[in-house]
C-alpha cells in the first residue's frame, strides 16, 4: 500500500504537534447527515468552522487534530486527519472499517483503527499520525480497543469468525511490539475500555440460552493482568435490546459513562465503578440523549439529543453527570467529540 501523501511539510506538522495544550478544549461534530461535513469549535460551541467533508470525528487528546471518516473515490472509506484550526486533510488509511471504533493514544501521536476488505477479517493497526506509518497488531474480527493510560499498551477484543454471538476474548499487547497476552477465556468478552485506576471495564454477553433473541450485555471489571474479574452491573434488558457498552472514564476513575443500546434504542447511562449503580442520564427512551464522551473531571457528559436515527432533529449538547437540563452547544449537529 502506498504511503499517504503529506499535504503539510513534516517539520511544520512536528512543530504543531509539539505545541503545548491550550487552556481551552476542542469540540468537533457532524452536520447534514446525508451530505456530512465535520466542524470544529471551542468546547462551548463558539467559533465553529468547517474542517472537512465526512463524519464520525474524533478529537485528539491535545485538541490540535481531528480524525474523521471521509468517503473517497469509488466509496473508499478513508481515515483522514486535519488540524482543528483548519487546513488540508491528510489520508492516513484507505479501507477503514467500523469507523465507530477509533482510539487516539494519550499523547496524540498514534491512532488505532481497523482496516480490511468490505467483508472478511480485519487488521487492527497502529498508525503514526506524523508519518502515516502503519503496523499490524492483530487480525480477526474485533469488538473494541483502547490504549492504556500511559499509551504503552493496547487492549482489544477479538473473535475468530463473524458468528453471532461472537466467541470473543480480550487481549493486551505492547504498542512497541511483541506477542499479545490473552486476558479472558470466557469467549463472551468484548469492548474493553482501559481506565485510569489499574482496571479495565469490558462487556460480557450473558444469558444467551435464556433470552429469545440473543444474550444481553453486562459490564465487568478486571485488572490489566486479567485477574480480579468482577461483575459490575445488573441490568434489566428487554428481549429486543442489548444492554450496556462502556463509553468513557473520568480522569480519576471515580465515574463511568456507558450507553444502553438495542433495536432502535441508544441513550446515555451513568455507572458507579465501585457499586455498579446505574442511572439513565436523562430519559430512557428510543430517541434519548446519546452520550459520546465524559469530561476529564467527570462533571459533564457530551452527546446529542434526538437519538441515533439520522432522520431525527439533533443538537449537540452537554449535560451535568448528575442529570439536569442540556446545554446546547451546536444546533442541527450530532456525533460530537471533544478534548475537554
Please tell me what each predicted stretch does.
Residues 9-18:
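Bacterial N-terminal signal peptides
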Residues 1-10:
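Bacterial N-terminal signal peptides that target proteins for export
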Residues 21-340:
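Sequence signature of WD/YWTD-type beta-propeller architectures
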